[in-house]
């Protein structure tokens, strides 16, 4: 696995000299996925764990994932959509 751009102390992403801020929800979703260590996290689990809402039926997760992937830039592929199930963090890309 590659080096993590996630700075947990500052709650941001760091790419070289550039720092990319994360909203509290983006940070919550990303750390939930990273901490799941490759396991699938369902939309309902994200809603319950990050938003504190125990039910689905919302596009909140989809909207946030689009924003988070934009901010992840070259690491966007690290967050995989598992169709019909949820999302999985596949690891940070290897540095070249």
Predicted regions mapped to residue ranges:
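A structural micro-motif at secondary-structure boundaries
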Residues: 1-27, 88-96
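Minor-groove-contacting beta-hairpin "wing" of winged helix-turn-helix DNA-binding domains
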Residues: 79-90
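Positively charged, aromatic-enriched patches within helix-turn-helix-type DNA-binding elements
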Residues: 12, 17-24, 28-64, 70-76, ...
């Amino acid at each position: 696995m590659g080096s993590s751009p996630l700075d947990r102390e500052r709650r941001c992403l760091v790419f070289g000299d550039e720092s990319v801020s994360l909203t509290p929800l983006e940070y919550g979703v990303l750390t939930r996925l990273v901490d799941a260590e490759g396991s699938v996290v369902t939309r309902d689990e994200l809603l319950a764990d990050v938003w504190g809402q125990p039910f689905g039926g919302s596009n909140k997760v989809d909207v946030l994932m689009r924003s988070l992937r934009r901010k992840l830039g070259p690491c966007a592929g690290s967050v995989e959509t598992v169709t019909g199930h949820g999302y999985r963090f596949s690891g940070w890309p290897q540095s070249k």
